[in-house]
């Protein structure tokens, strides 16, 4: 727990006798020496270097992998001397059988550097069966990982496997190849996908700490260039050196509601990718991350815009309800000893998704005023002020607009990353 939340005591305690103090000091030194000898020196903790939000797959479009290898690329943040993977079968209805897993640093494209290839084991075994609904941590893997590295994770699935757990918006091209080619330098792709299958985290051994970016499609990187790693958390990681930056943004995510597409709507085909509400997923996606010490929250625009578009109009929320959800995130972060920073909601007048109306704009301004002035968050990152059009503050600055008037382009992502003071981390 952070010392910032430790209560101060003014109770006077009786002084210890000098001889007793000397004896206790000697014992502490002796025990410290034993601990260092047993561990081979000061122990480094695990810290997250990459993460994604696992979501369910729409029933109408569930991919299937059968005697195939899924080769996936993730872009890490902080480096370390060892790493471990976190796989997940969270939304699976049956056990997930994995026949082989390899990791390596990327050479180019989906080609690996064979000198860095390592087989991944689970309790010493190269195969693992993950129970339905469960995650699975790998054994530590001896592989030095420099900061901001492209890591290739190859997972072989020997039997017919519906991909029921994935991250739907990776903005990264990954490939599927026939057979077990997990340790091959290059693979012949039979399919290209832009999701991450069954993979939710990479952690490294080191002395760093991590910050979670908890958000929606703007944090997830919607409308950024594929394979470019231009999401604002990626760009911030280049500035926050020595800190793990974990992108726990997911497109379409809301603070207060899970996905609930109207029957018969187009949203039925993709709404599952929106993920569980931030209030529901906070413990898994924030508190359970290894080495996490801080959180940046940028959420609320979908709570305003989804009702009546991709969710029932009955799920319309008030500004007070959005503020109440933010207060709950802050309370839970502080209870865990974390520092939490509030991001103001970006403007979206004229958006092409049908989110904007005067009522939603009034709610956005009310929520942003509360974030800025209430003192509830430990600090405020005023994304709204950075991203708005000086000539029309209800709109995105055209320089930063992807074209849908809601999501930033790559230049906008860079502006958001630069708006975060590195002194906070």
Model-derived features: where do they sit?
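Surface-exposed acidic, glycine-flexible loop patches that form ligand/cofactor-binding
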Residues: 144, 284-292, 331-332, 425
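N-terminal secretory signal peptides that target proteins for export/translocation
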Residues: 1-16, 199
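Surface-exposed amphipathic alpha-helices with a cationic face
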Residues: 326-337
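Catalytic His-Asp segment of secreted/periplasmic serine-dependent ester chemistry enzymes
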Residues: 254, 260-266, 305, 345-425
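N-terminal secretory targeting modules
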Residues: 3, 22-214, 220-228
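Conserved SGNH/GDSL esterase-like catalytic core that processes O-acyl groups on lipids
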Residues: 50, 66-72, 95, 101-109, ...
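Active-site-proximal beta-strand/loop segments in catalytic clefts of secreted hydrolases
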Residues: 88, 156, 214-217, 248-253, ...
């Amino acid at each position: 727990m952070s010392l910032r939340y430790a209560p101060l005591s003014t109770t006077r305690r009786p002084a210890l006798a000098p001889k007793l103090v000397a004896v206790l000091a000697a014992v502490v030194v002796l025990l410290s020496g034993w601990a260092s000898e047993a561990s081979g020196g000061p122990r480094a903790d695990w810290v997250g270097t990459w993460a994604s939000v696992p979501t369910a797959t729409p029933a109408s479009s569930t991919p299937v992998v059968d005697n195939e290898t899924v080769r996936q690329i993730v872009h890490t943040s902080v480096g370390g001397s060892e790493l471990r993977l976190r796989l997940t079968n969270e939304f699976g209805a049956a056990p997930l059988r994995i026949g082989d897993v390899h990791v390596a640093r990327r050479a180019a494209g989906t080609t690996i550097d064979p000198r860095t290839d390592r087989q991944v084991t689970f309790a010493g075994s190269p195969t693992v069966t993950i129970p339905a609904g469960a995650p699975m941590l790998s054994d530590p893997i001896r592989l030095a990982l420099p900061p901001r590295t492209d890591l290739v994770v190859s997972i072989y699935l020997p039997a017919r496997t519906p991909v029921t757990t994935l991250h739907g918006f990776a903005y990264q091209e990954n490939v599927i190849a026939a057979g077990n080619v997990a340790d091959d330098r290059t693979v012949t792709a039979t399919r290209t996908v832009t999701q991450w299958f069954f993979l939710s985290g990479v952690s490294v051994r080191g002395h760093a700490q991590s910050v979670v970016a908890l958000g929606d499609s703007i944090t997830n990187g919607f409308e950024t260039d594929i394979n470019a790693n231009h999401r604002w958390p990626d760009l911030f990681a280049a500035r926050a050196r020595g800190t793990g930056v974990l992108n726990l943004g997911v497109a379409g995510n809301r603070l207060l509601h899970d996905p609930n597409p109207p029957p018969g709507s187009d949203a039925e085909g993709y709404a599952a990718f929106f993920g569980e509400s931030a209030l529901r997923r906070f413990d898994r996606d924030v508190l359970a991350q290894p080495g996490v010490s801080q959180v940046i929250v940028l959420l609320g625009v979908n709570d305003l815009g989804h009702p009546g578009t991709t969710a029932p109009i009955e799920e319309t929320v008030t500004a007070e309800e959005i503020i109440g959800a933010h207060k709950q995130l802050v309370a839970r972060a502080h209870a865990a000893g974390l520092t939490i920073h509030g991001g103001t909601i970006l403007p979206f007048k004229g958006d092409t998704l049908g989110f904007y109306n005067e009522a939603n704009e009034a709610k956005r301004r009310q929520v942003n005023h509360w974030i800025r002035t209430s003192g509830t968050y430990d600090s405020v990152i005023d994304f709204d002020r950075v991203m708005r059009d000086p000539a029309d503050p209800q709109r995105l600055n055209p320089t930063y607009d992807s074209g849908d008037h809601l999501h930033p382009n790559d230049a906008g992502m860079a502006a958001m990353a630069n708006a975060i003071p590195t002194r906070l981390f």
